[in-house]
Amino acid sequence: MAAAKKPRVVLLDIEGTVCPISFVKDVLFPYALSALPSTLAQEWDAPAFARYRAAFPAEHASTPSALAAHARDLMARDVKIGYLKALQGYLWEAGYASGALRAPLFEDVAPKVREWTSAAGEEGGVARVMIYSSGSVPAQKLLFRHTSGEPADLTDAITDYFDTVNAGPKTEPASYERIAAKYPEVPAGEWLFLSDNVREVEAAREAGMRACVVQRPGNAELPEDVRGRLEVVESFEEL
């Protein structure tokens, strides 16, 4: 690891990489489910809610109960689709604003992000940190604005955000090529992608990026063959 060339861009996954998988599964998703009925009852005809309702397929947006049933079904099956992600982000925004939600970053994350970005402009230093997650870009920004770090808001250190809408599926090499193409001044080989998902790491590598599997507490155990053929880290301090 130490001999690897320092990247110019670090591209970070979120769930299982910068925060525990359990935060999304056991905190964010249940919060959205619990907040959904009252939000639909109070805001169904509100202008601010109209675009979220309109994004759902017409057959599921005719009544609050129909939309709620469809949203619950999608969340139960962990379907990653844009209109659901947008609705979840809207629901989470209120939770973050009230203090009910706060993203529990692994303790090495905030210091390392600050270290990477403070090295901008130095020879061999990292100039940019970016995010690529299946969660919507607005939800990503909310998470990094309300973290357990000190200070809690990390958004000033993050240059750009990508999701499955503006970049594409995370297991397809073309998505990483699309991300890198937005910054043509940085060759793909000078990007470092960090994720707990082996298929995502393989896709990024196929697109020419350096990529590492991040093995965090609570993540599924990695097969031995993965450790033999891919870079694996347990903390950003190893980078």
UniProtKB/Swiss-Prot annotation:
Subunit structure: Monomer.
Lineage: Eukaryota, Fungi, Dikarya, Ascomycota, Pezizomycotina
Main location: cytoplasm
Organism (species): Chaetomium globosum (strain ATCC 6205 / CBS 148.51 / DSM 1962 / NBRC 6347 / NRRL 1970) (Soil fungus)
The protein, known as: Enolase-phosphatase E1
SUPFAM superfamilies documented for this protein: HAD-like
Catalytic activity: 5-methylsulfanyl-2,3-dioxopentyl phosphate + H2O = 1,2-dihydroxy-5-(methylsulfanyl)pent-1-en-3-one + phosphate
Keyword annotations from UniProtKB, A to Z: Amino-acid biosynthesis, Cytoplasm, Hydrolase, Magnesium, Metal-binding, Methionine biosynthesis, Nucleus
Subcellular localization, as worded in the UniProt entry: Cytoplasm; Nucleus
